[in-house]
């Protein structure tokens, strides 16, 4: 009906042990091959681990050497600085106790050279100019002293010489005009003290010197221009804030007075600021005003010699 085939498991085992020597040798060869593979694996792992340990050790030595170098250089720097400080302290101590020897004098020249050099020195001394006491940068100090009445007289003489067409003008006439205005303001209570002082007369002279023309044809015209300059002097260097116009007016038209004021301001504004800020400029104007009297004396002397 049907056939069946059955294979027993012991049949393969039987074949393995059919030849005893052959089977044992084969088994031994298989085991040896397995052991050789294991030994190779172990040997490779040991070989790979040894260089890694060496690399780690070498890197650690390098790090230690790098860390040690800054410390050694720092110690060297400290030692060098200590040595330098010690040398400086020793040098300072030596300088404090050091006595400088006197400089050696040059040898004396022969007699003939000495006489020639002495004559040359004497000639050079004669030719050399004497140095000035003051330095070149600083101007010389000038002292000028004068009273109020003296300066007013000098101002009157200046106006008489400037206005040569006014034959009957006296040096005292301008002085009377100025004192009349000053007295009027005192009596009216516009000022507590007189305005006519040496400094204010110098300021007025500075204005009159550039404003009053030599072509003035009448005493009235001269008085109008002079009182205009006096009003500006009051306004600029006076003690009060404002002053009335009536004492300064010699004419009924105020527009003419203000026109003269504006022309004087446009002409003399810079000098009015300069005389207040520069003391040397004020001293020069003071000296010029005082010298006006000397010019009058010279003129009188020349007129006497002509006669």
From Swiss-Prot:
GO process terms (BP): axon guidance; brain development; ephrin receptor signaling pathway; regulation of dendritic spine morphogenesis; rhythmic process
Family annotation (InterPro entries): CDK5_activator, Cyclin-like_sf
Tissue: Brain and neuron specific.
Keywords: Biological rhythms, Cell membrane, Cell projection, Cytoplasm, Lipoprotein, Membrane, Nucleus, Phosphoprotein, Ubl conjugation
SUPFAM superfamilies assigned: Cyclin-like (SSF47954)
Site positions (Cleavage): 98-99
Keyword Lipoprotein appears in the UniProt entry: yes
Phosphothreonine modified-residue sites: 138
Entry keyword Lipoprotein: yes
Any one GO MF annotation of this record: protein kinase binding
Post-translational events: The p35 form is proteolytically cleaved by calpain, giving rise to the p25 form. P35 has a 5 to 10 fold shorter half-life compared to p25. The conversion results in deregulation of the CDK5 kinase: p25/CDK5 kinase displays an increased and altered tau phosphorylation in comparison to the p35/CDK5 kinase in vivo. Myristoylated. A proper myristoylation signal is essential for the proper distribution of p35.
Biased composition (Polar residues): 112-125
Region spans: Disordered: 96-136
GO cellular component, one term: perikaryon
Pfam families: CDK5_activator
Gene3D superfamilies membership: Cyclin-like
Bias-annotated ranges (Pro residues): 100-110
Modified residues (Phosphoserine): 8
Family: Belongs to the cyclin-dependent kinase 5 activator family.
Oligomer status and interactors: Heterodimer composed of a catalytic subunit CDK5 and a regulatory subunit CDK5R1 (p25) and macromolecular complex composed of at least CDK5, CDK5R1 (p35) and CDK5RAP1 or CDK5RAP2 or CDK5RAP3. Only the heterodimer shows kinase activity. Interacts with EPHA4 and NGEF; may mediate the activation of NGEF by EPHA4. Interacts with RASGRF2. The complex p35/CDK5 interacts with CLOCK.
Its job: p35 is a neuron specific activator of CDK5. The complex p35/CDK5 is required for neurite outgrowth and cortical lamination. Involved in dendritic spine morphogenesis by mediating the EFNA1-EPHA4 signaling. Activator of TPKII. The complex p35/CDK5 participates in the regulation of the circadian clock by modulating the function of CLOCK protein: phosphorylates CLOCK at 'Thr-451' and 'Thr-461' and regulates the transcriptional activity of the CLOCK-BMAL1 heterodimer in association with altered stability and subcellular distribution.
Protein name per UniProt: Cyclin-dependent kinase 5 activator 1
Organism, scientific name: Spermophilus citellus (European ground squirrel)
Gene: CDK5R1
């Amino acid at each position: 009906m049907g056939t069946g085939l059955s294979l027993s498991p012991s049949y393969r085992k039987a074949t393995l042990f059919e030849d005893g020597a052959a089977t044992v040798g084969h088994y031994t060869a298989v085991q040896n091959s397995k052991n050789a593979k294991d030994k190779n694996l172990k040997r490779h792992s040991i070989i790979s681990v040894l260089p890694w340990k060496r690399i780690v050790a070498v890197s650690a030595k390098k790090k230690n050497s790098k860390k040690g170098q800054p410390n050694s250089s720092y110690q060297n720097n400290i030692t060098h600085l200590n040595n330098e400080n010690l040398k400086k302290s020793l040098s300072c101590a030596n300088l404090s106790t050091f006595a400088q020897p006197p400089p050696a004098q040059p040898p004396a020249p022969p007699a003939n050279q000495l006489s020639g050099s002495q004559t040359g020195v004497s000639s050079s001394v004669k030719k050399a100019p004497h140095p000035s006491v003051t330095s070149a940068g600083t101007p010389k100090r000038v002292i000028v002293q004068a009273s109020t009445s003296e300066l007013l007289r000098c101002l009157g003489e200046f106006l008489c010489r400037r206005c040569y067409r006014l034959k009957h003008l006296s040096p005292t006439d301008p002085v009377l005009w100025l004192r009349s205005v000053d007295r009027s303001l005192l009596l009216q209570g516009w000022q507590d003290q007189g305005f006519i002082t040496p400094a204010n007369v110098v300021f007025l002279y500075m204005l009159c010197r550039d404003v009053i023309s030599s072509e003035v044809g009448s005493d009235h015209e001269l008085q109008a221009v002079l009182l205009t300059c006096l009003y500006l002097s009051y306004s600029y260097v006076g003690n009060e804030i404002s002053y009335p116009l009536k004492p300064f007016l010699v004419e009924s038209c105020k527009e003419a007075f203000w026109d003269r004021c504006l022309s004087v301001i446009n002409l003399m504004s810079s000098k009015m600021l300069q005389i207040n800020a520069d003391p040397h400029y004020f001293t020069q104007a003071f000296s010029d005003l005082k010298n006006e009297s000397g010019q009058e004396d010279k003129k009188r002397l020349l007129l006497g010699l002509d006669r």
